């Protein structure tokens, strides 16, 4: 019997269904979390073979000891997943420590976490991306902005969603940003005038698609956050062929296997010098493993 460790199986609340189906498919499902066992949904308790409570999932040493305990008791761990971007690096660290090969280890995380590193994999897939620069200070930031032209977009090179994302339209905006930013590494990109089209699906252990879908987001998350607008998206009945081709090429370039995937692309609203023509597909958030779930 294979051993599957599920980190924080009670969050989101619906994740008990993953545990149930893992058990139904012959896995030994071992949970690690910081919620008391009696607080877990009955459906989750019924789906777990054992649960190890830690005082805090933020405490790496405690979680490490929990994995070590399960390893001692049940033998080699075959899978370790949280299906939660917040724990992405920690999951990779534990896989590295315990040589769990069914998910990314620490040496594979750059292409997953850093937007600047994602771009070369988009290039490998033959998909253009916005020109970018890793900000060091005011002088180089202004130089890049003047090279590509305003507006430019800045955001953490490693980050989730639109957190700390800014659209800068003038030199004064760049000066404000440099004066007020935190110590994180920021990536500055040329602004892309387009709507977001996603490629979503399930990839099997051989890298082949089992299921494909997608949606359109007319207004970017950045604009929604910065303007306090409404979040709107809708599913497409049929994926445009150019999005499907881009999605399949990206999955292959990143070497994705045994995951759910959520890939984001811009579709240009108009011709844009240096990027492409109206309707062209531009790489956005490259395989954002934020939305990659273990399958």
Where are these regions (language model features)?
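Internal nucleotide-binding/catalytic subdomain
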Residues: 167-281
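Conserved small/polar residues in nucleotide/adenosyl-binding loops
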Residues: 290-295
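A conserved helix-loop-beta module that forms one wall/lid of the active-site cleft
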Residues: 95-164
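Short amphipathic alpha-helical segments and helix-helix/interface helices
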Residues: 16-20, 119, 142, 174, ...
């Amino acid at each position: 019997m294979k051993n599957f460790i599920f980190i924080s199986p009670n969050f989101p609340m619906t994740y008990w269904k993953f545990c149930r189906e893992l058990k139904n498919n012959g896995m030994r499902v071992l949970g690690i979390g910081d919620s008391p066992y009696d607080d877990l949904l009955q459906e989750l308790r019924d789906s777990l073979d054992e649960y190890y409570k830690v005082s805090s999932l933020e405490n790496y040493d405690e979680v490490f000891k929990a994995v070590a305990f399960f390893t001692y008791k049940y033998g080699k761990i075959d899978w370790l997943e949280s299906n939660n971007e917040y724990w992405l690096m920690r999951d990779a660290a534990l896989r590295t420590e315990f040589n769990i090969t069914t998910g990314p280890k620490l040496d594979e995380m750059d292409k997953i976490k850093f937007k600047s590193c994602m771009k070369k994999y988009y290039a490998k897939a033959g998909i253009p991306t916005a020109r970018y620069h890793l900000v060091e200070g005011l002088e180089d930031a202004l130089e890049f902005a003047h090279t590509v032209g305003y507006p430019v977009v800045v955001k953490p090179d490693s980050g989730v969603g639109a957190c700390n994302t800014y659209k800068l339209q003038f030199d004064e905006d760049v000066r404000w940003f440099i004066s007020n930013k935190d110590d994180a590494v920021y990536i500055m990109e040329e602004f892309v005038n387009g709507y977001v089209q996603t490629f979503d699906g399930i990839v099997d252990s051989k890298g082949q698609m089992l299921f494909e879908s997608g949606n359109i987001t007319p207004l970017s998350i950045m604009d929604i956050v910065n303007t306090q607008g409404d979040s709107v998206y809708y599913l497409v009945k049929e994926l445009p062929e150019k999005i499907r081709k881009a999605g399949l090429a990206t999955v292959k370039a990143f070497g994705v296997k045994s995951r759910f995937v959520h890939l984001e692309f811009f579709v240009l609203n108009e011709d844009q010098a240096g990027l492409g023509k109206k309707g062209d597909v531009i790489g956005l958030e490259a395989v954002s493993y934020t939305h990659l779930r273990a399958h």
